[in-house]
Structures are given as C-alpha cells and as structure tokens.
Amino acid sequence: MALSLRLITLLFGLSAGLSGHSAELTPFLHYYEASYEGLPFNARGTRSLERRSDGRFQFETTLGALFLGVEEQATFELDDAGTPRPLYYVTRQQGLGRQRERRLVFDWKEERLTRTGDKPREDPLTPGTFDPLSWQLALKQRLLAGWPARDTVLDLTMTDGGDPTEMRWRVRGAEALPGPTPEGEPGERALVLERQFETGSEERMTLWFAEADGALLRLEHREKGRLLTIWLTARGDAPPP
C-alpha cells in the first residue's frame, strides 16, 4: 500500500535540546486532508489532544480513505520540565483485507520498552525517547518556548518499538504557507522546518507550523519520487476532559 503506516505516522507530531521548562500543552481538535501522487482521491483525518481526569494526556490521530483506515493513540505524562514522557502507544491499520495492530509500553522504572502485536520484542529504554506521536508535541513545545533562529538544528529520538530513530530538523525560517489557509486567506506566515536525512538520500520532508499556536499547518514528504501532502482544513472544539 503506497500510503504506508510509516508515512502516516509522520503526520500525526532537539543540537537545541528540550531543556528547561516546556511550553504548556493545550487541548485541541484539528481536521486534515491528505493527497498522495498516484492515488485519485484524498484522505481525511483528525488530530486531537485531551487531558484526562487522572492528569495524563491522550493524543489521538485518525486517517481514512475508501479502503484504508489508520488510528493512533498515545498516552503520556509530563516530566518535571513539562515535557511529554510516553507511557502507552497503540496503532491500528486496516485496508485491502489486512489488519495490523502494534502496542508499546514504556516502563520508565525498569527502563524497558515492550512491543506487542506486530513483531513483538523488548528493548532497553533510553531516557528522552518519544513514541511515534509524542515527539510531535515535544517539538511543538520547543517552538512555542521561543521561535528558534534560522538554521538552528533541533534533535530528538523516536521509537516505534524497533531501533531508535534520531531525527534532526533544520529551521528554514518564517515563510508564507503554500496555498490558501482554512479561512481562505493566502500567505499565512508559518515557521518552516526541514528534516535532515543521510547524505545522498533523495527523501525530503518539510513541516509548516503556525506562529500563533504551533499547530501543524502542512506537511510535505517526498520519497521514491512520490509526494505525500497533508494540510490543515479546520480547527474544531477541543475534546472535553
């Protein structure tokens, strides 16, 4: 399936680190559309963040299009600096008669990461590691704490239950958002980040974040000659606590 799970999880979420106190997380509900070169239709999805009655946070994303459906959910708490510390993560993917589910359990006391469902395994857990969703909120916090200067490189570590992935994002600066905004106003200013891949890689990924609240406005990911584009279409009411 061209719209792979790995691509989809990149939608939904530092040489400058996550030091000091992080910006406060505010519940939200955002609506998105996605297009992929070679497919004659768009997918639609949501991203939402809520704070539960037990004080923990729940970050959810959904994406669906005809024969494809993907759901992700991350449960996390905040560490002493106010940065997300993942506890549980689950993803479910179904389409073309196939189903797949993966669960991650982060045991910080024992420093152990357990993956069940798809390709079960256990690995040591390194402090500061994020799940496939919570890293996006940690990056958003870093931006809201103070917009970094042009060419600043933001680093973080993410795991989907396999070997950790070191992600590096270069700040390209403030630019006009391609195309009209959800309100139909062209030229909205956004902070643009580009992911740095290994030298020689043809893979490209660019993120546009709203200057006002750090919302993800647009994502472009080109891999193997095809472009995946995801854009914000509307903001809704935040989920109730």
Where are the regions a protein language model picked out?
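N-terminal secretory signal peptides that target proteins for export/translocation
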Residues: 1-3
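Bacterial N-terminal signal peptides
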Residues: 6-16
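Sequence-pattern detector for short linear motifs
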Residues: 9, 50, 143-145
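Bacterial Sec-dependent signal peptides at the C-terminal "C-region" and cleavage site
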Residues: 16-24
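Acidic, serine/threonine-rich low-complexity disordered tracts
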Residues: 23-108, 148-241
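Hydrophobic, well-structured mid-protein blocks that either form specific transmembrane helices
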Residues: 99-145
